[in-house]
Amino acid sequence: GKDDLRERLKEITGQKESYDVLYDPVGADLFEPALRSIRWNGRALVIGFAGGDDKIPRVPMNLPLLKGCAIVGVFWGSFRVRESKEELANFQQLFEWFNNGDIDPLVSDVYPLEEAAVALRKLMNRQAVGKIVLTTE
């Protein structure tokens, strides 16, 4: 639950205010307690609402004021169109990190292209954990 998250973050980091950046692609009930654990001048990146439209969090507006933090919407589709040079540079950096082994994305499932419908159904039912990869081999 909400209190468990804050306690777990304190346990992991040894600090009440645990991190500078909150990356949240899910939304839902844990956004507010996660925001309460952000450091002064932190940034909360709202990536999406994988938790579903009915789980879009509501945040007391005094919370960003008290934390001195920014809540930033990150919409990749618009960023890609409006800032294409930066988007290309970001992808080049990500692939460099990947090729060097600096990042290791979680791949939960691999399907042949012929089973794309199965993979898509898993995504639509919110059953995917990590990435799903389709292969052509």
Model regions: which residues?
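Residues in well-ordered alpha-helical elements
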Residues: 3, 32, 62, 114-117
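C-terminal capping/lid region of NAD(P)-dependent oxidoreductase domains
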Residues: 16, 95, 102-110, 117-137
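Short catalytic-loop micro-motif centered on adjacent basic/acidic residues
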Residues: 20-23, 45-46, 105-108
